[in-house]
């Protein structure tokens, strides 16, 4: 199969986190990094209004952050939105890291990119708590899908 073959490269959660770390290391200061977060948020795929329901709201976030999940071929797929642009950028990073992986991979993943890019120390306490709530909710969805198997 040399012609017309689709080669699908699947990156591990750690590889994706390493890519994000490399991207953030490119920027000189936090104003550039915040702008990058804002741009990431603006590029999130459109979130259906039908998914903006209370059961998809992440508890513990100061702003409204909706997280929807689905399960297909043993992979958890996430989509999200927020009414706050920084939160939208943060959740876009988390979706990039976790979406398209098995529940087991998500549950066992060590989320280290947040600290390595310095994001945790450049967020207000309420935003930092919201970030932890986002990660927690992603892992809860993965646990639920694992239990259903």
Task: Show which residues each predicted segment covers.
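N-terminal intrinsically disordered, cationic/polar leader segments
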Residues: 10-21, 25-64, 71-72, 114-133, ...
């Amino acid at each position: 199969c040399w012609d017309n073959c689709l080669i699908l490269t699947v990156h591990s959660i750690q590889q994706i986190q390493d890519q994000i770390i490399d991207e953030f290391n490119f920027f000189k200061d936090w104003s550039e990094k915040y702008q990058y977060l804002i741009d990431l948020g603006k590029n999130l795929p459109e979130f259906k209004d039908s998914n903006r329901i209370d059961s998809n709201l992440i508890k513990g976030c100061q702003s409204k952050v909706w997280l929807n999940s689905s399960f297909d071929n043993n992979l958890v797929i996430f989509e999200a939105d927020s009414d706050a642009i920084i939160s939208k950028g943060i959740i876009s990073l988390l979706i990039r890291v976790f979406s398209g992986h098995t529940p087991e991979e998500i549950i066992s993943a060590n989320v280290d990119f947040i600290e390595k890019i310095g994001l945790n120390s450049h967020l207000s306490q309420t935003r930092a708590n919201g970030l932890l709530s986002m990660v927690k909710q992603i892992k809860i969805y993965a646990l639920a899908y694992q239990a259903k198997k």
